[in-house]
Regions:
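Active-site acidic-Proline motif in GNAT/NAT acetyltransferases
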Residues: 92-98, 128-129
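Terminal substrate-recognition subdomain of acyl/acetyltransferases
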Residues: 155-168
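A short, well-structured alpha-helix characteristic of acyl/acetyltransferase catalytic modules
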Residues: 1-42, 168
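Structural preference for long, well-ordered alpha-helical segments within the folded cores
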Residues: 107, 111, 135-136
């Protein structure tokens, strides 16, 4: 069973996150700070994600759990008052392609809609070459909304979910 829980300020959570960043396929898409380095220092993971856990006002990190075991990461952040961006990945090849990511995204969409009823739009912007992720996001209900170029010059696909009525 797939569930979500807030990422915790524990060595176990930071270590799990670091281990996923070392996985080559995942690292290709998500760890941009030291993408060309052979290692991802645990201290760097703790610094970057610790701030998000200890001061959850801008970015809200969660773990994706399969039967209570961490298998992935999902976070949301406010781009504007009514617009939320998402980042997500599953940590190892063994858990990809099984529908877990789509289920986690559906749960996160519901969580955001419950916790933040003013939100009108959710978006996610994977690299345009990350076909597996794009398939997952479409399966979860996200719809194509065009292409953008990220700050590193990479072509990304913009996918969105819009809420027609306020949640109230």
């Amino acid at each position: 069973m797939i569930t979500l829980r807030p990422m915790q300020d524990t060595l176990a959570d930071y270590t799990a996150l670091r281990s996923w960043f070392l996985e080559p396929e995942l690292r290709r898409w998500v760890w941009c700070d030291e993408k060309d380095e052979p290692d991802v220092p645990l201290a760097r993971v703790m610094e970057k994600y610790g701030q998000r856990i200890k001061h959850p006002k801008d970015v809200f990190p969660y773990f994706v759990l399969l039967n209570d075991n961490p298998i992935g990461f999902i976070q949301y952040y406010f781009a504007e008052e009514t617009i939320v961006g998402l980042d997500m990945w599953l940590g190892t090849p063994q858990v990809r392609g099984k529908g877990y990511g789509s289920e986690a995204l559906r749960q996160m969409v519901q969580l955001i809609h419950r916790k933040h009823p003013v939100v009108r739009e959710l978006f996610i912007d994977p690299d345009a070459e990350n076909h597996r992720a794009i398939h997952c996001y479409r399966k979860a209900g996200f719809q194509d909304a065009g292409e953008i170029t990220d700050e590193d010059g990479n072509r990304c696909l913009l996918l969105k979910i819009c809420f027609d009525q306020p949640n109230g």
